[in-house]
Amino acid sequence: TSLREFALSSSHLASSGALEFLEESQPLLWVGITGQKRCWLEQVEGTAAILNKLYEHYPNLGVVFDGWTPPLVSGDRSDYHRKESRKDNDVIQEIIKKLPSRKHRRFGIIAGLPMLEKIRIGMSVDLFVANYTTGSINIARICQKPGVGHMSNKMAYHKAQHIHYCTKVIDQELVEDQSDPENRVGYMDYSIPWQAIYNQLLEILIELKIE
């Protein structure tokens, strides 16, 4: 709670008025993007398909694209963190290109922003979709927002290590792990039909009574 309170009182974005445009959206969806390890293989085409379908039912939908979060103190690795943020931003731009009416949509890109700014933005979000593990810490664990978490079946065996409050997970039968020659749990990519994620998001929107 203290982190949330601090973020609410210390956000430069909020004090500048930059959040107001997004907060007028209904609903406001947080989309977590992974440009590095353990990613949803169809995240570009799949996320675009999900958003385009949601726009049919929710024309005032706003989207916050999240990605890499640099540590509170970057030290000598600031170049590395900028590079990782750019990877995520490249993925985000590919998704946005696939949204036909993007000129009239509300988007926010927060990949690379400090953790406190992300938490402040997360407090205004209605729901999220993101990787269940480290990719959703800010929105699911700290902001405690409802959402859909996706991960490989191999990672699902370790999901108890991650704190979630109201996150729906994808049925493991719909998840297909990508073979990793080194068999590293934390680096395994996975395939999921986008419709499985969309259906879970729709359930949450109905529960939230957002029309």
Residue ranges and their predicted role:
Residues T1-C39:
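A nucleotide-sugar donor-handling region in carbohydrate enzymes
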Residues I33, Y55-M115:
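Catalytic donor nucleotide-activated moiety binding site of glycosyltransferases and closely related
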Residues G35-R38, T69-L72, G135-S136, N153-A156:
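Short, solvent-exposed loop/turn segments at secondary-structure junctions
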